[in-house]
Amino acid sequence: MKKFLFMILILLSSCIMKAQIVFTPQWTPQAQFAGYYVAYDKGFYDEAGVKVDIQHPSVSYSAFNLLWEGSSDIITLQLVQAMIEIDRGMPLVNILQTSQQNGLMLVSRSDSLRTLDDFKGKKIGVWKVGSAELAYMMDVENEMNIKWVPFLQGMNLYISGAVDATLAMSFSEYLQIKVSGHEDKPYIRLSDTKYDFPEDGVYVTADFYQKNTEKVNAFVEASRKGWKWVHANPEEALDIVMKWAEKEQVHTNRLHQKWMLEEILRLQCEKGKDKPSFNLDARTVEKLSKLLMEHRRIHAPITLEKLKGGRP
């Protein structure tokens, strides 16, 4: 009996030693978050001594809301949104930067819309929530007078002809456009313009980081290891993504997720490079801060140092 109780105490001690973290990606399971699923399934988080619980947001309740209310410890978030929230008073800390190139596209429905000037005064589809701040600023700066038509998700507005063009992510909605029979339509990638700013990063609150520095750093290193493994083993990583999607009953298919994974891995690398750095560039942050201030999205400069919250 004493031996049995001793074994239970050992097991309990082992569980306590592993620090619990609740991690929430921006969306439901998909290849955009493959590195974290790999780190979980391959035991990289366990090896780092951190117990991670991956919880996905709902359509009506975002990852940021979960972080704000304390239900999540670590989330993914786009850089533009993170800087805006910091300016509003949310003390966010960037602990890992996965994206290096912008994935936003402006896709025309007509062969005649090819330059920014061509889109002036046109009706363009835009998400009701998120991802469009750079497009709005592009509209104002270039005096395009775009008539924005909101949609929740999917490309039905574009496919039905209700808009002249639409915003789309290169790793997601653009595939829907291509398979709907519009594969040869002109488009503009924001990554080919002055609005090419990185997107996905991983964030915690400053308070959580200060109180849990070691386990946050362990999470970061295990996540980096997961993403590096994905770059080296994309097909097996895709198997893991599909397993997570099935578990969460996400309606998708391997073709869509394969497209997404290939594009996400490309966007994780700087132009001309084939390996990710996982870091933010100080000059990029400075340029984005200046742009956001010019458009009154933020009211004071935000530096790389402030984004990193004292992290090396």
What do these predicted ranges mean?
Residues 145-148, 184-187, 247-263, 299-306:
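Short, surface-exposed acidic
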Residues 212-295:
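Secondary-structure end/capping motifs
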